[in-house]
């Protein structure tokens, strides 16, 4: 079990701890943000940006909260689990950028002054209203649906390839190993996204 300061990460990233000890939750997420400052987008991120430039109807649906897709230049982006560099007010629900790290104190809302929380989906919470519906609509409209670097076990997002397939899309999986959705993929490309996507772009455009 992965722990930090002796606490399971599932507890540190939980809605329950956000209610009882928001300062500790922020300290945990600030630790994670500090690690992310050393990470930059890879060739796979940039390949997706290039696809977006080439195709008018392109939607990138991500469960990642690290902001690397946006840093690479992706525009039509649905962050279904939120963004670790954004905060959301606990009173008025306004969202705002919160990029200072390390944090000196818990961020407060620029609108009403109340305390804020990380704008991410915590354990024990539902997805933000409307975000999955938009993702599912994009999946059902797709002619080609890539499933990239996911274990395909976190629902409801893991159901999106099924929705795309049922609507007639061709599904291509890119992953280091087989997953629970490999059986429905038309093609499974085994390997790292940072290596496979640029090569796929070069060969197929």
Model-derived features: where do they sit?
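Conserved catalytic core of sirtuin-type NAD+-dependent deacylases
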Residues: 1-205
């Amino acid at each position: 079990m992965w722990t930090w300061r002796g606490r399971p990460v599932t507890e540190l990233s939980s809605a329950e701890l956000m209610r009882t000890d928001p300062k500790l939750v922020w300290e945990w997420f600030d630790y994670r943000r500090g690690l992310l400052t050393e990470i930059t987008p890879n060739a796979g991120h940039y390949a997706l940006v290039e696809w977006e430039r080439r195709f008018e109807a392109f939607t990138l649906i991500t469960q990642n909260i690290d902001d690397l897709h946006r840093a690479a230049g992706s525009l039509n982006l649905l962050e279904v689990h939120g963004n670790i560099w954004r905060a959301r007010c606990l009173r008025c629900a306004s969202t705002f950028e919160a990029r200072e790290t390390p944090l000196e104190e818990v961020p407060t809302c620029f609108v009403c002054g109340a305390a804020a929380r990380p704008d991410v989906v915590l354990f024990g919470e539902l997805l933000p209203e409307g975000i999955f519906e938009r993702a599912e609509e994009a999946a059902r409209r797709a002619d080609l649906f890539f499933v990239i670097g996911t274990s395909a076990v976190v629902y409801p997002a893991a159901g999106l390839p099924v929705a795309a397939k049922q609507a007639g899309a061709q599904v291509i999986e890119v992953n280091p190993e087989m997953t629970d959705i490999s059986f429905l993929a038309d093609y499974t490309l085994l390997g790292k996204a940072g290596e496979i996507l640029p090569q796929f772009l070069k060969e197929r455009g």
